[in-house]
Curated annotation (Swiss-Prot):
UniProt gene name: DDOST
Cytoplasmic topological domain residue ranges: 431-439
Keyword Lipoprotein part of the UniProt annotation: no
Domain of life: Eukaryota
Organism this protein belongs to: Bos taurus (Bovine)
Keyword Signal found: yes
Protein location: Endoplasmic reticulum membrane
Stated name of the protein: Dolichyl-diphosphooligosaccharide--protein glycosyltransferase 48 kDa subunit
Family from the record: Belongs to the DDOST 48 kDa subunit family.
Amino acid sequence: MATRAARVWSGWWLLLLPLLGLAGASGPRTLVLLDNLNLRETHSLFFRSLKDRGFVLTFKTADDPSLSLIKYGEFLYDNLIIFSPSVEDFGGNINVETISAFIDGGGSVLVAASSDIGDPLRELGSECGIEFDEEKTAVIDHHNYDVSDLGQHTLIVADTENLLKAPTIVGKSSLNPILFRGVGMVADPDNPLVLDILTGSSTSYSFFPDKPITQYPHAVGKNTLLIAGLQARNNARVIFSGSLDFFSDAFFNSAVQKAAPGSQRYSQTGNYELAVALSRWVFKEEGVLRVGPVSHHRVGETAPPNAYTVTDLVEYSIVIEQLSDGKWVPFDGDDIQLEFVRIDPFVRTFLKRKGGKYSVQFKLPDVYGVFQFKVDYNRLGYTHLYSSTQVSVRPLQHTQYERFIPSAYPYYASAFSMMLGLFIFSVVFLHMKEKEKSD
């Protein structure tokens, strides 16, 4: 009997183990695709920073036949990291179309390439408005290379002045120079969603480092992208780095100094701080906004009416929150606008922060119809914030009009004077008797 009870308990325990595992793995599920599993050791500092922030990492090689992003119409992961630049074919059910569908579904993707870039990453970049240079090419800069460069001038020292001016994306603290070795990119000029996060200097270009230049390079000067980003219209985020070494422990801990005479030497690069900041942004730990309670009413009242009347004085309030360290806190912004729209905006005004919310008072236009209170906030580095509340505005009722309008007094006077004149004329005409003519 005891043996049977032990077997039953053992069976229940086996059933509970997966549930306990799911309960423990409560962080963002992240699939990491690698060229080889040795990258877990050579890039351990970056992966450790993700684990310390609660990410649940699943490491697999990019050609693993069991790979899958979607199962039964549901995404198996929240984030995707591709550290396999040389992959020629993804394994399992993953391909460029699947990754594009993952992005369309709101997933976040971090891609690191290198000079040994394969066709899948090139196609994925094209889907996102990024064009990689050819295989075996590298970014070259004969004026801004590191002292440890082997002679091809492909170990680039990127100045922080070339970073995108967006603290939400690249971090708020000042950084040491960035060490970069990899392939160059250019952005599609017709894609307004692409972000030039880190560009090359004016003396940089992308070409084959072991061949003489016989044609115009693919990317030249400031058009050479070292790191690029994308925030889609559904707030999905993607980052492309032309360098896999950028995320390596060796580059994180390396000293950096330009080979130019008199250049300052730094004991450590700014790669780690920038990599952490980029990962926080792309995985939506930074720059995420949401709309809280929205209220509107006439000034002096507390509840919204069934319909407003033209020229009413109204008050509009909205709560906007920002995700910070896993908690929602009030957002601090001074450029949030409210529009009162029918077809075109009739009123556009700035919202002022009062306590934990933004509010404003304004007078409705002397136009009736169906209007919207609309907040459409779209700023660099932040998710797109949109709020729309529809209301009706009716004309004045008959009893709400003034009995006498001062501007109409002349017309009143003319009407009464005409009536008085007609009355006097009638009296005179009816009661006047003509004198009889005498013979």
